[in-house]
Structures are given as structure tokens and as C-alpha cells.
């Protein structure tokens, strides 16, 4: 008896309630389709090693770089960003990585944004850069949110 104990679990899924007496076909969507819909509202970028993000940019000076960030999917509105600064580096040709001390997110649209990064000294103005995790063993996270 499912109701015989308050600790019993009861699950119900794939049920569709409709008003009236006309039944329509049940449209069950797959996980991938639902995930793509969710990416219009939230996207999470998370790395846990010396891994490069898919974003590149250029140095403005020896301690500042601008990186273009393209989103996985167009978002429903220009998102806000939540980040952990200490876990990221800028990689410049000929260096092992410069620790980022601050990140500002600007020039935001529904498909991209710009990371304005202040970092340790390395390279020079005009050098190409790669945005990367610092490999410290912690997990760096960037969360884009275009919630309602």
C-alpha cells in the first residue's frame, strides 16, 4: 500500500492535463532539446585544470587584455555574469600565464561579451592572448544569467 507509510515515495511523470474533452498528442521532448532551451537563460563555463577557454583576445598593455567571449547559444537578453577572478589567467606568447586580478564584463549582447582583464605583467600591447584556467586545482566558474 503506497499510502501506508509517510516515507514511501511515489513518482508521476509524462502526464498531460487538458481542459475540455478533446485529447491532443503528448509531445515528450528529449534532454538535449530541453538543455538548448535552458541555455537561452543560463550558461555555465567551468574548468578545473590548465584548460583554455574558447576565447581569445589582445593585450592593451603589459597588464591589461581584452578577450571576446562568444556564448554557446544566443541568450534571451544580454546576461549578467558571476565569476571567480582568482582562478583565471591570460596566456601570452612566450609566457606561462599571467594571473588575472580582476575581470570586468562589458560590451554585452545576446551572443557575446567582452572580458576586460587586469593581470600580472607579461607580453605587450597588440599581443594575442588566450583566456585560461590557472591550473591551481580549484574550479573556476563563469555563470551567464539572462533570467526573467
Give residue spans per PLM region.
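Phosphate/adenylate-binding glycine loop and adjacent helical scaffold
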Residues: 44-148
Amino acid at each position: 500500500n503506497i499510502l501506508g507509510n509517510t516515507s514511501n515515495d511515489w513518482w508521476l511523470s509524462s502526464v498531460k492535463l487538458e481542459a475540455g474533452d478533446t485529447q491532443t498528442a503528448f509531445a515528450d521532448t528529449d534532454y538535449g532539446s530541453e538543455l538548448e532551451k535552458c541555455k537561452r537563460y543560463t550558461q555555465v563555463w567551468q574548468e578545473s585544470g590548465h584548460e583554455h577557454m574558447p576565447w581569445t583576445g589582445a593585450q592593451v598593455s603589459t597588464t591589461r587584455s581584452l578577450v571576446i567571449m562568444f556564448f554557446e547559444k544566443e541568450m534571451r537578453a544580454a546576461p549578467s555574469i558571476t565569476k571567480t577572478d582568482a582562478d583565471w589567467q591570460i596566456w601570452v606568447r612566450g609566457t606561462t600565464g599571467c594571473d588575472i586580478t580582476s575581470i570586468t564584463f562589458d560590451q554585452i549582447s545576446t551572443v557575446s561579451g567582452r572580458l576586460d582583464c587586469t593581470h600580472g605583467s607579461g607580453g605587450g600591447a597588440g599581443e594575442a592572448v588566450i583566456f585560461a584556467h590557472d591550473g591551481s586545482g580549484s574550479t573556476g566558474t563563469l555563470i551567464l544569467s539572462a533570467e526573467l
